[in-house]
């Protein structure tokens, strides 16, 4: 491998969504992360609860309250991944899948969610059904989620760059990149580009735009 490294012009990044996977990949020679899928981080117990609260909330205030619960979890995940890849780029994809993938579709799960949120099962079912789509692969997902609910993009941006700043203060060299997913037309990107800088104006980390 040392001989290959001496002559190669090709570098290999990995796909990794956890600090452990990032560390393993680096030990095998990966020089960064080409795709870090943030949706995979939301399926642990407390995270999925907060995620579902955010999705099923009927108000912006309710979504922001749930996202405030998710923020420290996201920051912790990104901290571990960026630390494992110290000095190498980590390309983080903002939330991509349609929201119906995160909500309970079984009656038992819906009853539990109703109890946790203090609303009726019928209301939970109504909100879950409202998320169904004719073409979920190209519908309300990716950048369109971020444009409909910019508070999601804001939370993830704060988590990514907040983790990077913490590592900088500790003497590490984090190299975060943010991917805005599923852009169809430039207007969709423009809307997200308005949200992302506002989310880190209170932070002190040099950033650059790559399209």
List PLM regions with ranges.
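Conserved alpha/beta-domain cores
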Residues: 2-205, 209
